[in-house]
Amino acid sequence: MTLEQKVGQLFFLAFRQDTDGTPLWTYNNATDQVLRGVQPGGVCLFSENVHTVNQLRTFVQKIQGACSTPPFIGIDQEGGSVQRIRRTDAIPATNVPAMWQVGQTGDLTLAEQIGGVLGSELTVFGVNLDFAPVCDVFSNPKNTVIGHRAFSSDPQQVARFSTAVSAGIRKAGVIPVCKHFPGHGDTTGDTHVDYASVNKSLDELRQTELVPFRAQIQAGAEMVMVAHISLPQVNGDDTPASMSHRIVTGLLRQEMGFDGVIITDALDMGAVSAHYSAGEAAVRAIQAGVDMLLMPADPRAAYDAVLAAVRSGEIPEAQLNASVARILALKQKYGILSGKSLGDLSLLGSSAHQKVVNRVD
């Protein structure tokens, strides 16, 4: 791989709007130019990309065709309020209940089956990565961002149920992503808008927020998403966790022993974009120790900044190589590099899947 191609692997891009501002259902020249220019390691789909079954399958195939190294195709398919692919007249998908309801069942076998429903239906569209499950502990009733996206307010319950859902997603051949490290469950602010902080010490985090992530790592988690939350008692300032070397490298990589792929939360969110340029945010996150950059506000500017930082030595090339090795190893593990075919259409909204979700009260 050339240096330019290696840097491209660090990027996870999204294309939500057409040039006229309407939802992007049809692959267009603007998307093609960015994909061929950056050669990203992944592309994230949104509801704006979802119209019909055949439309979405074609859209994904065209994305794959523009990337010389097969990309991760990701989506937020958590269940409940966050499902980018929902049942419509044109898409007979299975609507999955909120994870809070799944946690309330107390049934870990059912939770794993729910993960299987989520993962297997994504394969129909060529999606190989699910930004789920939420591993946050819902410990602050004023937290409107997480709410019933979480499994429970009990850290051990979140640990058990999130690892079960991850296992189901994984068995379907899809990569689960544990989010939002080091825990977004005790915030009142919304990082989509601006800074949101968790005012806890590292010891307090270890007792609550980190419990599910520790369990996920022990169970073989391959990818972790780092949030943009601020941890003033840990960092001493408002630095987002996604740009904190102490959090990403010191805590997640070294103390907790995670050796998989670390990805940021979306870099176009207000907690980042209101305070950093796209290039600065990208470089700072890589310097903190992340492997992949999700949705920078300006993909080309972020790519150019990271490439320049590697060339200048501001980002060591050895670090770049280590990140690319992790990314490619994960793609290899899931058969992505050999080019996977689309999953069987019969999986979508199957009676077996409906029976599973019907068991969640």
PLM features per residue range, with description:
Residues 161-162, 166-178, 182, 191, ...:
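Phosphate/pyrophosphate-binding betaalpha-module
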Residues 22-27, 203-217, 241-248, 252, ...:
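A general structural motif
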Residues 1-37, 254-255, 273-361:
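Preference for extracellular/luminal or secreted protein segments
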Residues 249-262, 266:
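Catalytic PLP-binding core of fold-type I/II PLP enzymes
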Residues 65-70, 169-173, 254-259, 313-316:
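Short helix-capping segments at alpha-helix termini
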Residues 16, 24-25, 34-161, 180, ...:
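Enzymes and membrane/adaptor proteins characterized by extended Gly/Ser/Thr/Asp/Glu-rich
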